[in-house]
Amino acid sequence: MRIGILGGTFDPIHYGHIRPAMEVKASLKLDKILLMPNHIPPHKNTTHSSTAQRLEMVAQVCEALTGFELCDIEAKRDSPSYTVVTLKQLSRLYPDDELFFIMGMDSFIHLQSWHKWQQLFELANIVVCQRPGWHLAEGHPMQHELNVRHATLEALSHSSAPQHGRIFTVDISPQDISSTQIRSLLAMGEIPQDALLPVTLNYIQKQRLYFS
């Protein structure tokens, strides 16, 4: 089974997370995608809703969408959400499956700053979502990794046994949505209906999240 993994703060989860995940799922013919809320993101000091509330929002999205599942292993962890630790745990949970860790190009270009980043390739494939405006500069350290590890979608269709260590690039539709924008709109009393799944908007309104 091919399993995609998309981690994030999801504060709140919105179409800017979901639509690219759907496009990756379709492009790589993934069987399912795990949506994985962070508990203590290493690069962020705080969140605007509780871990329990973010878990519930993601759980409701997964109930509404086919092929998406909540993964709460990072949310249950008391230590920072380092990806290498998470992938080791997921490799034990899914020993016979092929893991695809999904990230944006904006994250990929900083991958060398991640904790034990080189071990990621021993545990999973990396899927880089290409967005307008982000390009690797000539001579960028990650350009070498991309050159060596890049795999085509055609190669994926011919592989049967689970593999890891490959980098797939997937062109995604531009998403002009961010959690920060959504929180700002809600704080001003505006309802960003086009940015959120109905179940998420309903939960936010019931819980009075992000409203000033």
Swiss-Prot record:
GO terms for biological process: NAD biosynthetic process. Its EC number is 2.7.7.18. InterPro entries: Cyt_trans-like, NadD/NMNAT, Rossmann-like_a/b/a_fold. CDD domains: NMNAT. It is an enzyme of class 2 (transferase). It catalyses: nicotinate beta-D-ribonucleotide + ATP + H(+) = deamido-NAD(+) + diphosphate. The keyword Nucleotide-binding applies. Pathway: Cofactor biosynthesis; NAD(+) biosynthesis; deamido-NAD(+) from nicotinate D-ribonucleotide: step 1/1. Keywords: ATP-binding, NAD, Nucleotide-binding, Nucleotidyltransferase, Pyridine nucleotide biosynthesis, Transferase. It comes from the Bacteria. Pfam families: CTP_transf_like. One of its GO terms (molecular function) is nicotinate-nucleotide adenylyltransferase activity. Belongs to the NadD family. PANTHER family: NICOTINATE-NUCLEOTIDE ADENYLYLTRANSFERASE-RELATED, PHOSPHOPANTETHEINE ADENYLYLTRANSFERASE. Catalyzes the reversible adenylation of nicotinate mononucleotide (NaMN) to nicotinic acid adenine dinucleotide (NaAD). HAMAP family: NaMN_adenylyltr. This is Probable nicotinate-nucleotide adenylyltransferase.
